[in-house]
Regions:
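Basic, amphipathic juxtamembrane/active-site segments
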Residues: 74-90
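Hydrophobic alpha-helical transmembrane segments
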Residues: 2-68, 76, 80, 95-127
Length: 127
């Protein structure tokens, strides 16, 4: 049981390191907060919450993995190497792909609600 709990401690330490050291991780957290606030305001459904939660976790997980790749590349070489650049670029690309997917999900869920708010000046739950 101790090693199981120790694993959680290590995981939280890793997340804390990413948040402290990576500006983009903090940007993702701000957007996650905005999505949660919008979800509460627009009263998204339970399935929509599940989709939003999965989407946010995918983006943040990609950021964590990108940080791990960058750390390992930096550890492996201190001079420029095109293979190191390719690894770092691929990690950044993975984050970009998940972030673009998250934007698409956000538009699908919040787009009609935001449009109704802009057009009518108010938002009412239409069900």
């Amino acid at each position: 049981m101790k090693s199981f709990l120790q694993g959680f401690l290590y995981a939280f330490q890793g997340i804390a390191h990413v948040v402290r050291s990576q500006r983009n991780a903090r940007v993702h957290l701000v957007f996650m907060g905005a999505v949660i606030a919008a979800g509460l305001y627009f009263r998204v459904t339970a399935p929509e919450w599940a989709i939003l939660a999965l989407t946010m976790s995918l983006v943040f997980s990609a950021e964590i993995l990108n940080t791990a790749v960058e750390s390992q590349v930096d550890l492996a070489t201190s001079t420029f190497d095109p293979r190191a650049k390719a690894a770092k670029d691929a990690g950044a690309g993975a984050v970009l792909v998940t972030a673009l997917g998250a934007i698409a999900v956000g538009l699908a869920i919040f787009g009609p609600r935001l449009w109704a708010l802009v057009v009518t000046g108010t938002y009412t739950l239409c069900k």
